[in-house]
Regions:
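Bimodal "functional hotspot" detector
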Residues: 1-291
Length: 291
């Protein structure tokens, strides 16, 4: 009787310890998953080996004011803005951001690169289409050193990491190209050209060219891949490729680098937020960009 009672007591004690262990660890597991699900990222621009590169950083607040402040602080911390730069204030109305800095803003190391990064980063937010820069209440109409005139409104057409492949100052067009640098950061390129071909043809021609590889940039896109057809809708585009794209299709999805270089280039050029990839009219993958 004593022996049975001892075994029962040991069994109950063991069971209670096991339950305590499970209860202690279970909420921790849930919290980890919830944190991963709620993880938010925002795009900022940093100077990496001479190229303004796209970097994703975590953020906590969905408030647009907080996002703007986060972008400016990151530019200060990474040398694209002078350390003593501060925001006097800003106002956002119908997609136009008016942002007022103190005079330390003018002490930029590379003024054109700073403006490129600032315009790109801020207009990457879905709430902002264009910006106006002020210094202590006065609109910045020209760059302080080069005296380059600035448009009244600065938007994506200002360009970033600009490359000019032009033979004439007439009929200039621009597409956005995205490549990876050797640190595996996406690098946006504003490519200006005179070619009469449609923008999609230009994008895929340049993504597959060796020109940018010589500058330590690559799209990972196989030269044999051909764009067969496309359909452009209001907020998405469907791209139909030759079956050579299957060489970059692994474990049920496109190789990430290929998907992102194509997807970002298309979304930024055509102002859509979704790219669908298809072969023989069958959808094989998609990329949705949100900010």
């Amino acid at each position: 009787m004593i022996k049975k009672y001892s075994f029962r007591k040991i069994a109950i004690t063991t069971l209670l310890l096991l339950l305590s262990f499970l209860l202690y660890n279970y909420p921790k597991e849930i919290n980890t998953n919830i944190n991963d699900m709620n993880k938010k990222e925002i795009n900022v621009i940093r100077d990496v080996n001479g190229y303004l590169s796209l970097i994703k950083i975590d953020y906590k607040s969905d408030n647009i004011d907080d996002k703007i402040s986060l972008i400016i602080e990151d530019m200060k911390n990474n040398g694209l803005l002078p350390k003593d730069t501060s925001i006097n204030g800003f106002a956002l109305d119908n997609g136009l951001l008016k942002i007022d800095f103190n005079k330390d803003f003018l002490n930029m190391k590379d003024e054109d690169k700073t403006i490129e990064a600032l315009v790109y980063s801020l207009t990457d937010l879905k709430e902002i289409n264009k910006i106006m820069i002020y210094i202590d209440g006065n609109r910045l109409s020209e760059l302080p050193i080069s005296k380059k005139k600035l448009d009244l409104y600065l938007d994506r057409s200002y360009g970033i990491n600009k490359i000019y492949d032009i033979k004439s100052i007439n009929d200039i067009s621009m597409v956005m190209l995205y490549f990876y640098n050797k640190d595996n950061n996406l690098v946006p390129i504003s490519y200006f050209y005179n070619d009469n071909n449609d923008k999609l043809s230009i994008i895929f021609k340049e993504l597959k060219s060796n020109t940018f590889i010589a500058n330590d940039l690559t799209s990972y896109l196989n030269n044999e891949v051909e764009l067969m057809n496309y359909e452009l809708y209001e907020d998405r585009i469907v791209l139909e490729f030759s079956d050579k794209l299957l060489n970059m299709y692994i474990d049920g999805s496109l190789v990430e680098e290929v998907k992102y270089t194509i997807g970002y280039s298309i979304c930024d050029t055509f102002n859509v937020n979704k790219v669908e990839f298809a072969i023989n009219t069958k959808k094989i993958d998609e990329l949705i960009l949100a900010n």
